[in-house]
Curated annotation (Swiss-Prot):
Its EC number is 2.5.1.75. SUPFAM superfamilies: P-loop containing nucleoside triphosphate hydrolases. It comes from Thermotoga neapolitana (strain ATCC 49049 / DSM 4359 / NBRC 107923 / NS-E). Monomer. Its cofactor is Mg(2+). This is tRNA dimethylallyltransferase. Residues 33-36 are annotated as: Interaction with substrate tRNA. ATP binds at residues 8-15. The record marks 99, 121 as: Interaction with substrate tRNA. It catalyses: adenosine(37) in tRNA + dimethylallyl diphosphate = N(6)-dimethylallyladenosine(37) in tRNA + diphosphate. Belongs to the IPP transferase family. GO terms for biological process: tRNA modification. One of its GO terms (molecular function) is tRNA dimethylallyltransferase activity.
């Protein structure tokens, strides 16, 4: 049995397509999105609509409040529990989403062997506060391989890599290689030509704003959720917060959401290119009906192996 992971950049059309595919093969969707796990964050995370969720059951959506901690290790554990439930009911589980870290946790396993040390983390954060950029330089010196995989702006993962090195004397990149992978999955990546994808992103952002994204953010803030939460730094939310703070006008806010989403989509595509055996489909050139037929056959065939 091999389960499909259907990944790809934001706004490529994963949800709409896979709801139709899964509906026709008696499958259920396991969301692979690190933002759709949060309650109350519906518009800005482009969650499946109630109608789509009624047509095909979705798992790993609305499981946490915005201030709750979560990581890829917990995602793997919880999503595999959902898979067990789906299998018991005789259905096919299909992972759908664009969070590359979650895909890695499933396919490559995840290293979680060194407990967090808040004292070390506090020291590292303070060091970075006093000398911005110093942690990146330390990572490049102590673990060059990890530095090539961790984005320069990803302070959280940089601190984790340094924390592991400081506690064990070993590089996190080495420890991760010792983590066993999982051969129960195969990866399908949906993509589009850049002009097509960027146009879809721009139109999606316009729809989000029309649907009430600003009011959604206001409501979250009024519920007591801090702008400093990791969840509230999601693209779309952080720009609205800065707009509400008067840092720029409405038009600039919309422009920044579109630009930052386009940059994010580009990073997602780069991430999924790391999977050598992934099967790619370009939705700009393939008809929806033709692709639906191909995906249904591919998912069912691999699941039956």
């Amino acid at each position: 049995m091999k389960m499909a992971i259907v990944g790809g950049p934001t706004a490529v059309g994963k949800t709409d397509l896979m709801v139709e595919v899964c509906e026709e093969i008696n499958a259920e969707i396991v969301s692979m999105d690190s933002r759709q796990i949060y309650r109350y964050m519906d518009i800005g995370t482009a969650k499946p609509t109630p109608e789509q969720r009624k047509r095909v059951p979705h798992h790993m959506i609305d499981i946490l409040d915005p201030d709750e901690y979560y990581n890829a290790f917990l995602y793997r554990k919880d999503s595999l529990k959902a898979v067990e439930d789906i299998l018991k009911r005789g259905k096919i589980p299909v992972y759908v989403g664009g969070t590359g870290l979650y895909a890695d946790a499933l396919v490559r396993g995840i290293f979680e062997g060194v407990p967090a040390d808040e004292n070390i983390r506090k020291e590292l954060r303070e060091l970075e506060r006093r000398e911005p950029g110093i942690l990146r330089k330390m990572l490049e010196e102590f673990d060059p391989e990890a530095a090539t995989r961790i984005h320069p702006n990803d302070l959280k993962r940089t601190i984790r890599a340094l924390e592991v090195y400081m506690k064990t004397g070993r590089r996190i990149s080495e420890l991760q290689k010792e983590t066993k992978g999982d051969d129960r999955f195969f990866i399908i990546v949906l993509t589009r030509e850049r002009y097509d994808l960027y146009d879809r992103i721009n139109r999606r952002v316009d729809r989000m704003v029309e649907m009430g994204l600003v009011d959604e953010v206001k409501r979250l803030l009024s519920m007591g959720y801090s702008k400093d939460l990791n969840s509230m730094k999601t693209i779309g939310y952080k720009e609205v917060i800065e707009y509400l703070e008067g840092k720029y006008d409405f038009e600039k806010m919309v422009h920044l959401i579109k630009r930052n989403t386009r940059h994010f989509a580009r990073r997602q595509i780069i991430w999924f290119k790391r999977y050598e055996n992934a099967i790619w489909y370009n939705l700009t050139f393939v008809s929806k009906e033709e692709l639906k037929k191909t995906l249904k056959e591919l998912i069912v065939k691999n699941f039956s192996v």
